[in-house]
Amino acid sequence: MTIYNFSAGPAVLPKPVLEKAQTEFLDYNHSGMSVMELSHRSKDFDDIIKDAEKLLRDLMAIPDNYRVMFLQGGASLQFSMLPLNLAQGRKAYYVVAGSWGKKAYAEAVKLSKTIPFEPILLASSEETTYDHIPEIDSAKIDKDAAYVHITTNNTIEGTSIYDLPETHGVPIVADMSSNILAVRYNVADFGLIYAGAQKNIGPAGVTIVIVREDLLNDEPVLSSMLDYRIQAEAGSLYNTPPTYGIYIAKLVFEWLKELGGVDEMEKINREKSGLLYDFIEQSDFYTSPVKSPKDRSVANIPFVTPSQDLDAKFVKEADALGFKNIKGHRSVGGMRASLYNAFPRQGVLDLIDFMKKFEAENK
């Protein structure tokens, strides 16, 4: 039985990457050691992390005036690290179009009770259960603000921001955890990008931060571990980094480059997601909670049947047939097909075949 992993993260990894990691697991580069055993100060690991950064720069066309960091703590730590480094004494705007954007804003509000800055809710679609991307009134943005924070892909609700808001020069900061390397964004349009690795980059434990150099604070009053400048100047080696996760990320970057890069990956992702969206649209049994096609994610596709009982039956039968982790997030319900970069097109076709069969038997 073929297993298809629809998990929203940690998620499916490319089979060639896993196979290469397997062959190198006990003896990396004739060192007699596993990558997990390499000193982070060794030449072997120095080559790994430098190659990983170069590959990521090439894939995303990252300009030279941006620094790339491989950090720890997940994207959730960035909810605090970001305002601590960039926003002290200033305003910071937040667009809340999903659960993770809400958490980022809530963390900023919490921090503002002890750190002098003003988090402001610029736009939200919470009233309609995040079923769309809210309209953003750029006239409300103070030109002296520290940043405007967005989440480019809402993993739970299945919406995405593809067209960036006009911010009149105020840096856009993006949580890009679930669609980094899946669709093309112009890095120069952002002041800072951060992303947890466990969707499109590798195993959980690595967080990518890409920041424009002029935004690095000269004298932030905060812990060295939370200081972007210290981490950047140390080459992500201020303390022991997640070495094996960075190694897997490098292999994923190599795989993506060989595939044709981000532009080719976006074509593949739009085709995969389009197959499923088209089927849902043509069905009167399944429904997408995201009404506007322009807001729909290519990475995370939620859908429901006519009842919660049928949803539960669908998940149970799908799981038995090898469609794993397709249950929707507990806050939304229904089902969610996470079609990250490594998810195969055949898995989408097989899912649609099952959906047709389930509909015929339960309509």
From Swiss-Prot:
Write out the annotated subcellular location. Cytoplasm
Q: Which Pfam families match?
A: Aminotran_5
| Family annotation (InterPro entries) | Aminotrans_V_dom (IPR000192), Aminotrans_V_PyrdxlP_BS (IPR020578), Pser_aminoTfrase (IPR022278), PyrdxlP-dep_Trfase (IPR015424), PyrdxlP-dep_Trfase_major (IPR015421), PyrdxlP-dep_Trfase_small (IPR015422)
Q: Kindly give the PROSITE patterns that the UniProt entry links to this protein.
A: AA_TRANSFER_CLASS_5
| Note describing how the cofactor binds | Binds 1 pyridoxal phosphate per subunit.
Tell me how this protein assembles: Homodimer.
Q: Which NCBIfam families match?
A: PRK05355.1 (NF003764), serC_1 (TIGR01364)
According to its UniProt entry, the protein's GO biological process terms are:
L-serine biosynthetic process; pyridoxine biosynthetic process
Listed under catalytic activity are:
O-phospho-L-serine + 2-oxoglutarate = 3-phosphooxypyruvate + L-glutamate; 4-(phosphooxy)-L-threonine + 2-oxoglutarate = (R)-3-hydroxy-2-oxo-4-phosphooxybutanoate + L-glutamate
Looking at the UniProt record for this protein, which Gene Ontology cellular component terms does it annotate, in alphabetical order? cytoplasm
- Pathways involved: Amino-acid biosynthesis; L-serine biosynthesis; L-serine from 3-phospho-D-glycerate: step 2/3
Family of the protein in this entry: Belongs to the class-V pyridoxal-phosphate-dependent aminotransferase family. SerC subfamily.
Q: Which gene specifies this protein's sequence?
A: serC
Primary residence? cytoplasm
Protein name (record) = Phosphoserine aminotransferase
